[in-house]
Amino acid sequence: MHFISCCLRRSTVSIAVSRSLLVKRLFCSGWPGDDTIYSLSSGQGKCGVAVVRVSGPASALAVRRLTRSLPAPRTASLRSISHPQSKELLDRGLVLWFPGPASFTGEDSAEFHIHGGPAVISGVLQALGSLPGLRPAEAGEFTRRAFYAGKLDLTEVEGLSDLIHAETEAQRRQALRQMAGDLGRIYQDWTDQLKRCLAHVEAFIDFSEDELIEDGVLNDVDRAVQQLQTDMENHLSDERRGERLRSGVHVVIAGSTNAGKSSLLNLLTQRPAAIVSPTAGTTRDVLEVPLDIGGYPVLLSDTAGLRDTSDSVEQEGVRRARQRVEQADLSLVVVDLTQLPSERRHVPVFLRGHLKNILERSSQQQQHILILNESDLVSAEQQRSIQTSLQELSGAPSACFLSCHSRDGLEELLTLLHNTLKTLCGDPLIGSPTLTQTRHRTHLQKSIEALQQYHEYRDVDLALAAEGLRLGLLSLGRITGRVSPEEILDVIFRDFCIGK
């Protein structure tokens, strides 16, 4: 009894709040209660088939009142759907019944697959709203109930949201991996290891003298905590590939005036998105266009030409251009080949000057591609000479000859772009899943700081060292939304047969 009371006291005072309390803190709302919710789950507007979802204890009642009987579980049944009061026929469609807990939300649930006309959808929703105990669902409430029921952790919830909003193949693949729990399993594995470490330290504090727990237990904890810290730091050092893929790669087209930057934007977007003119300084503001290049999301920006000018409006455009260069993940530096010096020995100096304006404003993580435009106006011999000059430039970025007019070199540029985007974002199907949310990064950094506290106090005050493990566990738990003090006690009872 002494053991149990000590464990309960310690876990109550110092360990993380229970999962239910954590959920309430995260969402600032309580449990679903006895409400049954309904909503249109498919998109708004006219469509061939619309899906209306119902979840909660009155789901069976809703199906019976609208279709007269409950279909077999998880079987699509063709039914007449009528208003429960007027008995007016609303539609004929498929009805599916999912008894809890084997449903998406963990509750009794149902789906009405009906024709997608606005009048049909409105009629079915009004019929459901006329039933006692049913109310329209709030935004994201079905998924929130799935989280409450333990069907999804927070990383899987975020993966589902990302999948819904995915616009490219790479985004879809990353979201699917996260929704399938690949990222959550990494955090859960670290959480399990940290629970074990904390359980061992707490057992050593309370029972080492009475139960003769060996000192070697703490040495094992030291090694495990150090390895956990290393794994977390490696996970953080991903150059933000997952976050970049999720939000889009910022690509800026930069260079001097009249180099062909706007022509390049129009070529890549395959439409006249930017005004093209032989007059220098035509582009004075940033023009941003979303693109899908090889399955990767790109936010492509055309900018004002970089030059000194007395025009106040153009000066502001140049300032914004330089700001975009500083913020970009990838810079496409455009050079007009017809402006190169005639003497080969001056070419490296000319190119170095153009690149300097961009490179000196770029971060170390930023990638660059040098685009040599107007290649159709330069002979093959001149191109070879320019290629030789590029090789003489130390640290020169990858280069590509291109003609925005004839489209020569476009395939080579797209291949180079795709490979660079793959470097920036990674391949979602290869290797460990990467961080996708800023909050993941924040909580992991806090967890690492807490583990460092364990190392600092380990030989000074073991209780303070244990507090570091608790804080680290709390931070990890906030990523997935799952942490419970009872799980610490389970590990203690399993690993230490104290009191037999």
UniProtKB/Swiss-Prot annotation:
One of its GO terms (molecular function) is GTP binding. Mg(2+) binds at S262, T283. Keywords: GTP-binding, Hydrolase, Magnesium, Metal-binding, Mitochondrion, Nucleotide-binding, Potassium, Transit peptide, tRNA processing. GO terms for biological process: embryonic organ development; mitochondrial alanyl-tRNA aminoacylation; mitochondrial leucyl-tRNA aminoacylation; mitochondrial lysyl-tRNA aminoacylation; mitochondrial methionyl-tRNA aminoacylation; mitochondrial tRNA modification; mitochondrial tRNA wobble uridine modification; mitochondrial tryptophanyl-tRNA aminoacylation. It comes from the Eukaryota. Pfam families: MMR_HSR1, MnmE_helical, TrmE_N. Gene3D superfamilies: P-loop containing nucleotide triphosphate hydrolases, Probable tRNA modification gtpase trme, domain 1, tRNA modification GTPase MnmE domain 2. Forms a homodimer in the presence of potassium. It is found in: Mitochondrion. Its cofactor is K(+). GTP binds at residues 255-262, 281-285, 302-305, 373-376. Residues 1-73 form a transit peptide. One of its GO terms (cellular component) is mitochondrion. Disulfide bonds: none annotated. GTPase component of the GTPBP3-MTO1 complex that catalyzes the 5-taurinomethyluridine (taum(5)U) modification at the 34th wobble position (U34) of mitochondrial tRNAs (mt-tRNAs), which plays a role in mt-tRNA decoding and mitochondrial translation. Taum(5)U formation on mammalian mt-tRNA requires the presence of both GTPBP3-mediated GTPase activity and MTO1 catalytic activity. This is 5-taurinomethyluridine-[tRNA] synthase subunit GTPB3, mitochondrial. It comes from Danio rerio (Zebrafish).
